[in-house]
Amino acid sequence: MWRRTYLLLLVIRVYFALSPSYLHPDENFQGPEVFAGRVLSYPSKLPWEFTADKPIRSVFPLWPIYDVPISLLKWFYAETGAPTPPPPQVIYYVLRGVMFLLGFVLEDWAVYELVPFARHRRATVVLVASSYVTWTYQTHTFSNSLETLLVAWGLVLIRRIVVNKRRSSVFSCAVLAFIAVAGVFNRITFPAFLAIPGLQLLPHFRRKSVSPPVSLFSFVGFGIFFFGIAVLVDTAFYRPSATLWDALHSPIITPINNLLYNSDSSNLALHGLHPHYQHFLVNLPQLLGPAYAMMAISLWGLPVIPTWLKNARAVSALSATVILSIFPHQEPRFLIPCVPLLLSCFRVSKSRLFLAVWMIFNAALGFLMGIYHQGGVVPAQLAMPSIISASSVESNDALPGEIPVVSATVFWWKTYSPPLWLLGTNDNSSLNIETRDLMGVPGPNLIEELEKLLPPCNVAGSKQAGSVFVVAPKSAAFLDRYTFLPSSSSVSSALELHELWSYRKHINLDDLDFGTEGVYPTLRRVIGRRGLAVWRAKRAGCN
């Protein structure tokens, strides 16, 4: 029975891995955007983390996840004689597939090893596989998803080293050193998860000190070695012209830059400040749902310590949550590594009520976060070259025999930032697409930008030079007054929006306005009018 359940959950995980929801801009801009632009020369815009004077993001742990698959695809297309590099949609789904495979193999394997009792392992693996976090966050290209795997395998190796008392565990210590370096360079939050469980290694190292402390030498030596490689990789990435002496004399150590940046509360204020209880009272319940409620209820028996608290997984997750709660910027994805750890401590209740609530919770959040959350941004950006080519006006400066150039400006409004790399390559330069991200500016500001850019149309029926497009959620009621309706003969404004393309599976949660509109009207607008559309902006009377 458990095998059939696990296989069904595996199919569900594949479905969500290939669904184009968009959970946070970091999943594109701190990974695929960087390497797609570097390897394939796709249009890209590096985020500030990579362009600051003291960059805070390392490419060392990202290289095997993004650079290697993209480079292999580039090589494969070149070997098969393809005239162009791999299209962005292929890159997009291959990277999603890589994240799925990493989670399927490494996360499930680690969970299976971390549970000490064989009779609980199958149920625990199924429980973790049934979490919407596994379906969605863990299959997206987040550094947090990679951190989950590194934390889990860090705990696995610590357990192997501690349990194996008769051997020096040189190889396990070397691998643990690599995981520690990769984890720190991936996210500076990584040590919070392994700091306390790692104390179990001290007696092991001390016990081996009777003879030469081979395990300790292995861990420290390989740690220094991998640290040096990581620093050299980052220095070469950010300063390509630097010599080896330059890298040794003035290295770029991104974790230190990251720590210094996040230690300044004024920097964190730019990203949003939260109360210190946000992780425990909001984020963990959002990630774990009824399982977290059952864990909280079990604490009422104190001072008797619940069984699920008496293991390194729970200590790792809860101690990390306490440490991360010190910092005032708190997002749910920071706690993604806690999900498999805490669920592996939880004994599945045989109550039908709990199982029903668990399934409803994960199904609802799975569809919301895995399909609808900003779900139209990626399909719209992938379709944008085709939309523009089919609808734009050719520029007037093309000479006879030349490929005419189509220029367009695309305004994105009330969406997450569109990944530029999804526009792909354009070797014939027939398309010139300028993307302007207006984020959530007031509606009148959008119209003002359109009025500035749209050329005058003095003669009715004349064609306007260039093209202007607007991408926005269909729930943005402000645009209704400008939307062109063929059934209406009257022109309500001097500016018209002609809908060219739409994608139904898109919900913009940032557009919720319960305070002004009320709960029901807001939900009716945001959910009832779900979808993302592409409009072409024109002045009234222009063709």
Curated annotation (Swiss-Prot):
Root EC class: transferase
One biological process term in Gene Ontology: GPI anchor biosynthetic process
Biochemical pathway: Glycolipid biosynthesis; glycosylphosphatidylinositol-anchor biosynthesis
UniProt-listed Pfam families: Glyco_transf_22 (PF03901)
Topology versus the membrane: Multi-pass membrane protein
GO cellular component: endoplasmic reticulum membrane
Residues bearing glycans: N428
Domain of life: Eukaryota
GO molecular function, one term: alpha-1,2-mannosyltransferase activity
Keywords for this protein: Endoplasmic reticulum, Glycoprotein, Glycosyltransferase, GPI-anchor biosynthesis, Membrane, Transferase, Transmembrane, Transmembrane helix
The keyword Membrane appears for this protein: yes
Listed EC numbers: 2.4.1.-
Annotated InterPro entries: GPI_mannosylTrfase (IPR005599)
Family of the protein in this entry: Belongs to the glycosyltransferase 22 family. PIGZ subfamily.
Role of this protein: Alpha-1,2-mannosyltransferase involved in glycosylphosphatidylinositol-anchor biosynthesis. Transfers a fourth mannose to trimannosyl-GPIs during GPI precursor assembly. The presence of a fourth mannose in GPI is essential in fungi.
Descriptive protein name: GPI mannosyltransferase 4
Organism: Aspergillus oryzae (strain ATCC 42149 / RIB 40) (Yellow koji mold)
Organismal lineage: Eukaryota, Fungi, Dikarya, Ascomycota, Pezizomycotina
